[in-house]
Amino acid sequence: MYLNQLEERGIDSPKKLSSIVPNLHIPEYGSSMTSSIYLRGYGSRMENPVLGLYIDDVPVLNKNSYDLEMLDIRRVDLFRGPQGTVYGRNSMCGVLSMTTLSPSSYSGVRALLEYGSANSMMASVSAYGSSEDGLAVGGGISYRHTDGFFTNAYDGASCDPSDAVSMRLRLEKQIKPDLYFENILSAGYVNQGGWPYRQYLADTKELLATSYNDVCAYRRLNVTEAVKLRYDAPSYVLNSISSLQLLFDRMDLDQDFTDRSMFTLAQIQREGALTQEFVLRPKQEWKTEWWDWQSGAFAFYKYNRMSAPVHFKHDGISELILGNANSNIPEDVAGGYNDPLLIKEDNFVIGSEFGINTFGAAMYHESYFTFGKWLLTAGLRLDYEGNSMNYCSDAQIHYRFQPTMPDYKPFETVYKGRVGNHYVEFIPKLSALYDAGSIGGNGKARAFAVVSKGYRSGGFNTQIFSDILQNMMMNGLMADLGVYLDDPGTAVRAENTAYRPEKSWNYELGGNLEFGRERHGVSLSGSAFLIACRDQQITLFPPGKSTGRMMANVGRSRSIGVELSALYRLGDFALSGSYGYTDARFTRYDDGNSDYSGNRIPYSPEQTLNVRAGYTFTFMNPSFRALSINADCSGVGRIWWDEANTLVEPFRMLYGADATMRLKWVDVRFRADNLSGEDYNVFYFKSIGNMFFQRGKPFRWTVGLVYNL
């Protein structure tokens, strides 16, 4: 998709590509931090994504930065299927590649002003041009605000107000006839609320209003500095892409999402990353008519200093800690007290500090062999990745055992240590493409087959340390009293802090057809795939009234599906559509308590659908050049919300429309989404044994002015 198409459809973030790309689902929930991506049956709510994101050939290493402002994005490409041979880690189901406007190829001034529902507004301005000495300079800045679409019934305030600023500065220059230089600096700042979760009562199937009594907020500052060099030698082209990526963010959560004073989380990340890639491609005598190739080397280092204290309040202490502890004290030890164990503090903090190092290096090669109408590709990547985590979690309280202790006694729990892992992966790819060429002089056809391996990195569970320390605290308190528990009340153990990489094999067949000419033609494409996955990573909620969540390797799964896309043009009329179907199931998943083998993989939709039709009226009037009117619909579902497949979101459709008037100096755009006011769920989770949903955004509209000079 290109710039005009993105702006006409109101696609200002990657989340709005959902359903437009078959089998792609990026639900909009929580905040800008929650960039959960599902593609072809697989995905992740936490940590490492299944879809890699590249902006101007630079990989975005932290998923927290995926929800970005698409300021002056010239082109968007999504390569489906494992792309690990060239792109490496976390591209198990595909790669989303974005290219920004280049001042070497575009010169002018652009400005955009929008206003819409919920007092939403957006303003951006950018300028591009070249100087006489060959230096090309371009840059832009944007500001976005909304009052929010959801209300917190506890205090009547908006849950999800948001302010965001983005900027980019791009410099390009041909230093020598054979040396080209690019420098791209981008930054973004977000300050918002979010998490308008509603408690679900399974017995009555009632969805309560959003109501929580503590702050839910997210702030993020991310900066990326990229330097690209291209050396054009007589026999080869060597590209160097270097980047420095900084991320500073803070998430504050009322983690029980109720109006009770249970517990809150403040997660603060200070992350820095370096990447370096070299890509070598041949020219002239280094390649032949039948053989072409590319080779590359990639390395990265990332360090994340994270602080994630959990603040336990009165109700949380009473229910989660004292309630569990007192229920496990034998009656003959309790001395007739209903609550023999007391804690002096009305609130206390479980502190958690982490230092996480992630690093890796890779070498890869792809060869392309042309034999008549056949193009054969063979590639291999050797990928090494290591990680380590230093952690320290602690809490200090004063407790009293009423039958034997006249006063309170201090008690401290500390859990600290270091874990680390190293992985080596071989990532191969084989593909065959048959180009039938022209069909009767009025079209063309191609068919392809691909076998490739996918790989998603392992990592650490930082959000489970509060549960681990609660477990240790309860056992420690009981042991201090001479009571030893066979069952500490939770299944969480220290070994849950790390999880392994996820690996898959992808088998795919497909093709495309094109008929007609530019203003009257049809293009069709389709594919069928099978993915076999081992060591699948799934987000789990520990049993009971736990406060955290964790990623675990649960076993094996498989996903089969089809993807179809079509485009029909007749003069100024255009009709496009895409459809995806996925049947993704566990083939082996037994956690010791339940066997979920054969069940659907949660959160990933069974079907996606998008249809868009539009007509452009062209006028021979310089003051009113054209009018474009479009209507679209997008569907997604069914979605299974849990591993047991007891909760299912049905297939739903959302309808939208947009219109653009192209005047002499400006374009006037109008867009409306969710025209029917559909009420639907976009997310589900559990916290301390309670179930929660988030609803999708209601009907909304936007009107804007676009200026291009």
At which residue positions do the language-model features occur?
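N-terminal periplasmic accessory domains that precede
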Residues: 15, 36-41, 54, 78, ...
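Membrane-embedded beta-barrel scaffold of Gram-negative outer-membrane proteins
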Residues: 228-233, 237-253, 448-450, 473-552, ...
